[in-house]
From Swiss-Prot:
The gene is hicd. It comes from Thermus thermophilus (strain ATCC BAA-163 / DSM 7039 / HB27). Catalyzes the NAD(+)-dependent oxidative decarboxylation of homoisocitrate to 2-oxoadipate (alpha-ketoadipate), a reaction involved in lysine biosynthesis through the alpha-aminoadipate pathway. In addition, has high activity with isocitrate, but is inactive with 3-isopropylmalate. The record marks R85 as: Important for substrate specificity and discrimination against 3-isopropylmalate. (2R,3S)-homoisocitrate binds at S72, R85, R88, R98, R118, Y125, K171, N173. Changing M208T: Confers enzyme activity with 3-isopropylmalate. NADH binds at A70, T71, S72, N173, G261, S262, A263, P264, D265, N273. This is Isocitrate/homoisocitrate dehydrogenase. Changing V238M: Confers enzyme activity with 3-isopropylmalate.
Length: 334
């Protein structure tokens, strides 16, 4: 049986990095069937919606989805909504999984191999804001249900890793009702995972420790806003957003995406770095149970990052296509 993979290029360099990731996926030799769909700003301009209903239907008909990048306007546009935020809510993709691992590139700290698991559906990102004259108020929603399931997802990830360690990053010392509910709930769920070493850490200390001693961390679970910040910090430790993959995972489907934006300044020039998209594809293979193929893809990427060619953002002069073909050749040699 072939795996059905939904491909959404999105905007900007998404049109370059998703075809690159597809090329690498095809080189794995796995039985794959690709289904193309559209979403993003370009789709909104053309069709009046950033996520057409048929795109949602295609995602639901596939085993997993690989998304490229989406542009967001810098002004308020009536009727527009961010494609990824919409899909997270519509498909209940409650776990945002962001690995940060040392790579053989300039600026990457050695010894980093961690995963940040971020609750993806609530917190301050419920976008319930209001303003009264000169005062603006935003609601933060933390529920026991969402805290239980993100805690369980993070604990499963930690249980499957060699160090089996989970840090719960929180701000319960200042926000005891909301952050305290999250912390207490994850601790309660952790009783079902006796093999996992569970510790809690105040988020500001966590940020400092990530900078000073990132090698101490294995898996970190936290709330939406805090995870959004910590995961970009972690990406900065290992080479930046251009190398950062991610997965938005629910109980029935998942959407994987490179963390970088649509990069309109280089879109169409053929020099975009496809590493994050290819590593997101590797995460997708792991999600599908093809763990050996996922490891081979990651190994092939590291081989090319180490010996070249590299794209301009990493100090080289390779095109997107040249880098991709080098990864394909490395993959074939493994």
């Amino acid at each position: 049986m072939a795996y059905r993979i939904c491909l959404i290029e999105g905007d900007g360099i998404g049109h370059e990095v998703i075809p690159a990731a597809r090329r690498v996926l095809e080189a794995t030799g796995l039985p794959l069937e690709f289904v193309e769909a559209e979403a993003g700003w370009e789709t909104f301009e053309r069709r009046g919606t950033s996520v057409p209903e048929e795109t949602v239907e295609k995602i639901l008909s596939c085993h997993a989805t690989l998304f490229g990048a989406a542009t967001s306007p810098t002004r308020k546009v009536p009727g527009f909504f961010g494609a990824i935020r919409y899909l997270r809510r519509r498909l209940d993709l409650y776990a945002n999984v962001r690995p940060a691992k040392s790579r053989p590139v300039p600026g990457s700290r050695p010894g980093v191999d961690l995963v940040i698991v971020r609750e993806n559906t609530e917190g301050l990102y419920v976008e319930q804001e209001r303003r009264y004259l000169d005062v603006a108020i935003a609601d933060a929603v933390i529920s026991k249900k969402a805290s239980e399931r993100i805690g369980r997802a993070a604990l499963r990830i930690a249980e499957g890793r060699p160090r089996k360690t989970l840090h719960i990053a929180h701000k319960a010392n200042v926000l005891p009702l909301t952050q305290g509910l999250f912390l207490d709930t994850v601790k309660e769920v952790a009783k079902d995972f006796p093999l996992v070493n569970v510790q809690d850490i105040i988020v500001d200390n966590c940020a400092m420790q990530l900078v000073m001693r990132p090698e101490r961390f294995d898996v970190i679970v936290t709330t939406n806003l805090l995870g959004d910040i910590l995961s970009d910090l972690a990406a900065g430790l290992v080479g930046g957003l251009g190398l950062a993959p991610s997965g938005n995972i629910g109980d029935t489907t998942a959407v994987f995406e490179p963390v970088h934006g649509s990069a309109p300044d280089i879109a169409g020039k053929g020099i975009a770095n496809p590493t994050a998209a290819i590593l997101s594809a590797a995460m997708m293979l792991d999600y599908l149970g093809e763990k050996e193929a996922a490891k081979r893809v990651e190994k092939a990427v590291d081989l090319v990052l180490e010996r070249g060619p590299r794209t301009p953002d990493l100090g080289g002069d390779a095109t997107t296509e040249a880098f991709t073909e080098a990864v394909v050749e490395a993959l074939k040699s493994l």
